[in-house]
Each structure stands twice: as C-alpha cells, then as structure tokens.
Amino acid sequence: MAKKAAATPKTTRKRAADDTGRSRKRARVQPAAPLNPIPGPSQSTEKHILLVHGAVDAGQLGLSDDQEKEVMRPRVHPLVLQLVTEDKMGPSGLEGVAAGGMHSLILDSNGKVWSFGLNDSLALGRLTKPPDGTPDNIPELVLGLDGFRATAIVASDNLSIAISETGELRAWGTFNSDGLLGFMGHKDKVMVPTALPAFSKKLICAAACGEDHALALTCDGTVYAWGNGASFQLGRRILERRKENGLKPEPLPLRDVVAVFAGTHNSFAVDRAGAVFAWGLNQMRQTGVDDAEPLVKTPTEVHALHPDNHAGARVVQIAGGEHHTHFLFDSGAVWACGRAGADRLGLADDHPRVRPKRDDFLVITPVRVAFPPPPTPADPAPVLPPYTAGFSATRIAHISAGERYTLAVDEDGILYSWGEGNASQLGLGNESNAQTPTRVANTALKGHRVVVASAGGQHVLLVGVKRDGTL
C-alpha cells in the first residue's frame, strides 16, 4: 500500500501564514523616500570667507563705524576673516549668506546664524540698543537658536528665516512695509526665532523671500505662502480689510514641487517634471507667463521655460527684482524677461529684441542673455561678442537679483553684474550702470573664487574661497 504524504502540521501552516502576513505588513508600512531632501551641513574642506560691497548706511555690510562711505568694489570682510581664521565659524568658515533689504545674515559651518544691519523691525534676531544690546553694524550671533543646527537662511526686507538640519523652520522680524505684523497670532514684531504652528507637523526643505512675502517648500513637494498678498504673490486673494489673513501660511494648489523662488512682488515654483509656475505682480511681464494680465492671481505655468523648449535643460534657479526676472538652466544658460529699460535684463543693443524700441520696452517671453567668453592668459578681460557670433562658452552656476540689478557667478567663480547700481551694488567702481553682464574684477577677487552671491536692497554679500587653496 502506498504511503500517504505526511500532513503539514497546523502550527507550521499557521506560522507560515503569520510570517507572510508580517512580511506583507512590513512591506506596506515602508515609507517612501521624500521628494525633497532636507539640506545638510556642508562637506567642503575649503575655508569660505565673506566679501562685500555696496551701501553701508544701515550697517548692512557689517564693517562697523570704520566704514562711512559705500564700498565700491568687493573687499574681504576683515571681522569675518578673523573669525574664520580663528576657527570660530566652524571647520570650513561660511556655509551661506542672505542679503535682505537693509540687513544681512550669514551662516557658519557650525550651523550658527550671524546678523548685522538695520534692526528697526528686529530682523537681526537680537537686541542692539544699549545697555544690553550688541552692535548692529558688526556680525553677532542671532539669539534663541541654541540646539538649532541651521543649514539654510533667507531674508526679505524685514524678515529672516532659518531652516534646520531636521527640517524645522524658524522666522523672526516682520512684514511691515504695509502696516502688517510678523506672524499670525503675534501683536508685535518678533525678535526671537519662532517656529510657526502651520509647520508643526511638516518637514521644510527650502524657503524663499520677496520684499514682503515668504514661501516654504516641504519635503513632500507642497508650497506654502504667507505675508503681504496685495499683488497676489501668495497665490490667493487677500482682502484689504482682512490683510492679517495673509500672515498664516497656506498651501498652494501645486504638486511635486522641487524648488521655490521669489521676486520682489511675485513667486515661482519648479516641479519634478521641470515645469515652471509663476504668480504675482506682472505689470512689466516679469513672470514670463504667456498673454498674462498685470496680476497673475494663481500659479500659472510659464510654457516658454519647459524643458521641451530647451533641449531637455531645466530651470534650477530663478532671481527676480522689482520689474525683471532671470532664469538659470542646468545647462549654464541664463534667460530673462520683464522690463528691459535701465539695463535690467542685460541685453546688448544688437540683440534682436532690443532694436525695435531702445528707450524702455518689455520682453514678454524670456530670451537668452549673452555673457563674455571665459578669460584666458592671452585675453584676461574678453568683451561681449556681437550677437551674430552666437553665445560664448561661459556657463553660469549661480544668480541673484536686487530690485534693479542682477549678479551671476560662472563655473570658474568669476562674478558678473548688470543693471542699475547707484550705491555701488554692481561692484564696478565708479560705474553705476552696466547694460550687459560685466566682469567684476579687482585685487580682492583676483585671488578668490566666488561660490555664492546674494543681492540685497543696495548691498551685496559674496562667499569666496582662495584660488590657491590657502586662507
């Protein structure tokens, strides 16, 4: 008689079923990787220092009372250099800078935030009046950030924001250019860096500031906006009699956003597919939105900037002023739109979009901005070639804009500026205007490679490293 196969013990079947169930359960709760990572501390081994130029009337360059006249060309900041040399700003010196309207923030590689400049709105995050205050015109640490390792900083005209390595956002100062207060629920200016209730359960990976509004981006790709919404820069309608409603951060109807940027009175976002969205003030066509009204009331795609129209290249940075905007692509090309008068866009006279009307005209659809060729030993100061010669090989790595001027840094650390600079914010000495991107060159920059530039109201902060590798 044939033997029957031994029956599988019930306990074994049950255990197998339990194991399978546990396996499925484990698989179901596996968290997906976040769309946007929280910025971490710099891993650089180079010493980063601060260079500055521009207006000094509010102490925004942090040069103390020793500097009474505007700084016409970039110069190494002596106090910060001393702090970096003494390793008081961490192993690699500076990690970041943020120039506001008339105040400045710097982030060191210990994760500490320093401030200097105008403190009428408490944007410095510390007391500056005697007898207990510290000077407002030299770098001093922001108070109330113990245990908070900052990895990113941004600044508006009167507001300051820091993001930590754990995704926490704190802000201080105010939105007061239109009589507004600092934050929902606060009746006065806020000096101590404050966590916003709207983000208590959110991880923030990036932020951006216009003149009087702010954007925050979460790790899951959601954009929040708050501040002054008079020009729809918040992407929603704010009634004049209910202006305080703009002080509460609210999410925008956008998904999978990977970057946010702000012009003076408008806002921008880039999603995972590379599409660019804009909203806010557009009376000079500075958003780039096709056939748009003077106010773009909700996030609207800028079709001209889609990767399909740029051989797959994507926008990675946007820098906007009052009436102009520049867009940096990952190909190193820069495009611009808005008011072209007063040299805002950096277009030469022979550019096809300039010829019809030179006085003051609008560029509705973004056009590419030309840069001089990279310098060589034989030609250390090349000029901009004719438009018909095509675009040079210069690749831009970083851009920043003030109200009426723009800065760009190329891959070799060379700084360019153009636009209006009546307070020496162009860094070109006696030249207060530059029609096209012009190399900023002087003794201080000759030995330094610029890494990051931040354009403030009328002052500029630069992060630089020595080209020879020394401090």
Where are these regions (language model features)?
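Short glycine/serine- and acidic-residue-enriched loop/turn motifs that recur at repeat junctions
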Residues: 14, 26-28, 37-46, 50-73, ...
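Solenoidal tandem-repeat scaffolds enriched in leucines and small polar residues
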Residues: 153-159, 164-303, 318
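Eukaryotic helix-linker segments that join adjacent hydrophobic helices
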Residues: 71, 77-98, 102-178, 190, ...
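Conserved core positions of repeat-based scaffolds
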Residues: 52, 103-106, 115, 159-162, ...
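Surface loop/turn motifs at the tips and blade-to-blade linkers of beta-strand repeat domains
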Residues: 88, 142-145, 196-199, 250-254, ...
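PEST-like, low-complexity acidic/proline-rich intrinsically disordered segments
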Residues: 1-24
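Structural WD40 beta-propeller signal
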Residues: 100, 107-108, 145, 156, ...
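Short coil/turn segments that connect the beta-strands within blades of beta-propeller domains
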Residues: 47-48, 102, 110-111, 157-158, ...
